[in-house]
Design a protein with these regions (language model features):
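Active-site neighborhoods and metal-handling regions in enzymes and metal-associated proteins
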Residues: 1-373
Length: 373
């Protein structure tokens, strides 16, 4: 916890003993205390009749009761700081664009390696490789979450994280669901690509293309002010609902700026009722899963931009993530001409932004890959 007054900042930790190096980073007005001292500090705030705002969703009953007994003027509202974080300013958006170029380079290099690797490979090999490629960048701080690398039946487990016990060798004609991301000095990334080995089965390519159509549907969304994430969730799912398919997770979540990769207060899900605003960043990640068979998910991070239509304010989606889709998994006949054009334009942007940072072989491969369609 942190308690901030006009004069001091108190940080409460389970273990308040920090190294001298960390303590030296703080101002003299920052005091490190034990969790056990939080109750005492709350009771001695001496706010003198000021009102206290509490967000009941994010406070434990224990501390709620302490504050309620100590202070009479309480207001129950949503935490306004959550909206400050959710709506990125222009500098944060510009930096996140740069972070996604760095991340896109690492992921594209990984995909090239994965597609051209001929030896036996395991899920943990994949985790180690993508983590190593990201860490080569001087702006990289750490992973934004544990890497999800599920092959075959493990891909059907939405948040599967391989370990020494579950680690699986990839077989010929498997598909891999790779969901990973990084924390950079310029922002946070989160991206999923589903990749094939060898010649994919028809069920793989058809399902992948159907998920891609949902992904594109959301990417092209245009909507007026006041619309919540529930509407965008419906837009994405509608392409799968038309063919009797669905997925048992939200279509997207808010993403922080060098903060939590899952950030509120809004989401792109069936029950989200918070109005979307310009500058919000969230994931676009529809999927399809068959238990004990395979999993498919395609994820880009996107942001909301203003668009004037008929002299009125509307919003559009701008994609931040830069990494190629697996063209080997696309059934071209299932795509409309507009969807094909969208993929082509996206891949052209990927090549323009990413290819300057690739070596000769990687660049040649990427050019051929995106032009297969």
């Amino acid at each position: 916890y942190a308690l901030i007054s006009k004069k001091y900042i108190y940080i409460f930790l389970e273990n308040p003993k920090l190294s001298k190096k960390i303590v030296s980073l703080f101002s003299k007005k920052v005091e490190i205390l034990s969790f056990l001292e939080l109750e005492t500090k709350l009771k001695k705030l001496n706010i003198k009749g000021e009102k206290i705002l509490k967000d009941i969703k994010y406070i434990s009953k224990y501390y709620h009761d302490i504050i309620r007994k100590s202070y009479k003027k309480l207001i129950y509202e949503d935490d306004p700081i959550l909206n400050f974080k959710a709506i990125k300013n222009n500098i944060e958006i510009r930096n996140m664009v740069k972070a996604h170029i760095l991340d896109g380079v690492a992921l594209t290099k990984f995909i090239y390696w994965f597609k051209n690797f001929n030896a036996v490979i395991t899920e943990l090999d994949i985790v180690n490789k993508i983590d190593a490629l990201r860490s080569q960048n001087k702006n990289f701080l750490c992973k934004s979450f544990p890497t999800i690398a599920g092959s075959g039946k493990n891909g059907a487990i939405v948040h599967y994280i391989p370990n020494k016990i579950t680690n699986r060798k990839l077989n010929k004609n498997d598909i891999l669901l790779l969901d990973s991301g990084g924390q950079y000095k310029l922002g946070t990334t989160d991206v999923t690509r589903t990749l094939s080995i060898g010649k994919p089965e028809e069920n793989h390519t058809v399902s992948y293309t159907q998920v891609l159509k949902s992904h594109i549907k959301l990417s092209n969304a245009i909507f007026p002010e006041g619309i919540s994430g529930a509407y965008l969730d419906y837009l994405a799912r509608s392409k799968l609902w038309e063919i009797g398919k669905d997925y048992a997770h939200g279509t997207g979540h808010g993403v922080g700026y060098c903060l939590n990769v899952h950030e509120g207060p809004f989401s792109i899900s069936k029950n989200s009722n918070i109005a979307l605003k310009e500058g919000m960043v969230f994931s676009n990640e529809p999927g399809y899963y068959i238990e004990n068979k395979f999993g498919i998910r395609i994820e880009n991070l996107v942001t909301i931009k203003k668009k004037i239509l008929n002299k009125k304010d509307f919003f559009k989606i701008e994609t931040l993530t830069l990494a190629p889709y697996d063209v080997d998994l696309i059934t071209k006949s299932l795509l409309t001409n507009e969807e094909l054009i969208w993929i082509k334009n996206y891949h052209n942007t990927v090549f323009k932004k990413i290819s300057p940072y690739l070596d000769k072989n990687e660049k040649s491969w990427l050019f051929k890959e995106i032009n297969k369609l």
